[in-house]
A protein has these predicted regions:
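Helix-to-loop junctions at the C-terminal end of transmembrane segments
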Residues: 68-82, 284-298
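Juxtamembrane intracellular "pre-TM" segments in multi-pass secondary transporters
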Residues: 2-12, 204-241
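Structural signature of the two symmetry-related core transmembrane helices
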Residues: 85-100, 300-315
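Helix-loop boundary and gating motifs at the non-cytosolic
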Residues: 5-63, 235-267, 271-274
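A membrane-interface helix-boundary motif in multi-pass transporters
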Residues: 48-51, 167-190, 380-399
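Glycine-rich segments within core transmembrane alpha-helices of 12-TM secondary carriers
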Residues: 145-167, 364-374
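Multi-pass alpha-helical transporter architecture, strongest
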Residues: 191-202, 393-418
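Helix-loop junctions at membrane interfaces in 12-TM secondary transporters
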Residues: 101-114, 317-329
Length: 418
């Protein structure tokens, strides 16, 4: 009976496969792309401290734009027949941008293309996350969401290992590293698009609002109404505030891990292999958290992940040697998938299903949009002190605040049930 309960359906499997595809792009952005940018920046005379700062500023631009567009597109996507086409638009922007990054040969155009590609990727996640309520039932959401992240972590290793061997072994086959990185970006884009095809074929929007006249204008009206009355649902309100804080730190660590290690002067090959270990460790860890969700509510598991990340941020403050980065990579892998998957499914269960796109637009503001603050903390802290450790270590305060606010949300939920 237990196995039958958690047997993945074809539609759920297609949804999970998109995590496998887009996670390859995430891994590329976290590993090889910063190295590509570092090479271009060095050729352009950019210092190591400013290299980290410019990378952080570019990430901040992405999150601000995503924060503005996310709820607007999400609200529009709740309209019958809109979600899938807008998802496809964002997907193609991301995939084409991934290919185009390889054509850049100076650091500034590269950053511009990176921003466009990352906006397309982030936009696609608004619709992808909101599809969870269409592809599965509330009691299966924790498990399906966890499996999405789990298979995303391990599946993304397939193209990444190919790309890593190509880049590290480029000299042995008479190829320049820049050419190898260009090919690696193309491989990633093809993988991302290919693994999305089953979802494009199978997905049908189940929860929606009917088509209205002036649909775009009405989407603004609906989101205005939701924002106006958001505080009335205190469970959702306090959760979003908590999520804004703790996931900010999570995404900042993901976005800037390689850039941080490079700024500290750590060995490039060691950094890449350490981050590959993160993906491998994250696979069983996410599955474990998914199984734990069958015994313990997400309201108990999420605080465990937040507390662990607080310790990780403090540890990063003292990081100076490569073996410490390996420890950091393992620790991040243990809790990264759990906090992301459980937060997504927890939110999906406490919002109106027919307004999933609208609410996940807000979720995206408080998620990837929130990492504007974290990346700015790292960038400004690094430039003011001349030390990357200070900037990265200071994000621990975001996890502490997020932990407290999440407990407030849980108490609100308990009061509502009573």
């Amino acid at each position: 009976m237990q196995k039958k309960k958690f047997k993945i359906t074809p539609l759920e499997r297609a949804w999970i496969l998109y995590d496998v595809g887009n996670s390859a792009f995430v891994l590329m952005i976290a590993t090889l792309v910063p190295i590509f940018f570092n090479a271009l920046a060095e050729a352009g005379g950019v210092s190591k401290v400013n290299y980290l700062a410019y990378w952080g500023y570019a990430s901040s631009v992405v999150t601000v734009v995503t924060a503005v567009l996310g709820p607007i597109l999400g609200t529009l996507a709740d309209t019958k027949g809109f979600k899938k086409p807008i998802f496809m638009l964002c997907l193609f922007v991301g995939v084409l941008g991934c290919c185009a990054m390889g054509a850049a040969r100076t650091w500034l155009p590269f950053l511009v293309i990176f921003i466009v590609a990352k906006i397309g990727f982030s936009g696609s996640l608004v619709f992808y996350d909101s599809m969870l309520g269409d592809v599965t039932t509330p009691e299966r959401m924790d498990m399906v969401s966890s499996r999405g992240y789990a298979w995303g972590y391990i599946g993304s290793c397939v193209p990444f290992v190919v790309c890593l061997v190509l880049v590290l072994g480029s000299g042995a086959i008479g190829m320049s590293q820049m050419t190898a990185l260009t090919i690696a970006l193309f491989i990633t884009a093809v993988w991302w698009l290919g693994t999305t095809l089953p979802l494009l074929r199978r997905y049908r929007q189940v929860n929606y609002v009917e088509v209205e006249q002036h649909a775009i204008r009405q989407s603004f009206v609906r989101i205005g109404h939701t924002l106006k009355h958001l505080y009335e649902d205190k469970q959702v309100f306090w959760f979003l505030l908590a999520f804004f804080c703790y996931i900010d730190g999570v995404y900042t660590i993901i976005d800037m891990a390689t850039a941080y290690g490079t700024a500290l002067g750590l060995d490039t090959t060691g950094l890449l292999l350490a981050l590959l270990v993160t993906q491998i460790v994250a696979f069983p860890s996410a599955l474990i958290f998914g199984r734990l969700s069958a015994k313990y509510p997400s309201s108990q598991l999420i605080p465990v992940c937040i507390a662990a990340y607080t310790g990780i941020a403090v540890f990063a403050f003292f990081l100076t040697q490569q073996w410490q980065f390996w420890v950091l990579a393992v620790l991040v892998g243990m809790f990264q998938g759990g906090v992301q998957a459980l937060s997504r499914s927890h939110f999906a269960k406490i919002i109106p299903a027919e307004k999933s796109g609208e609410y996940f637009g807000l979720f995206d503001i408080c998620g990837k949009g929130a990492s504007f603050l974290g990346t700015m903390i790292v960038s400004v802290g690094s430039q003011l002190t001349g030390s990357a450790n200070v900037g990265v270590g200071s994000i621990a305060v975001l996890f502490v605040i997020g932990f407290v606010l999440f407990r407030v949300s849980c108490r609100t939920e308990h009061a509502k049930q009573v």
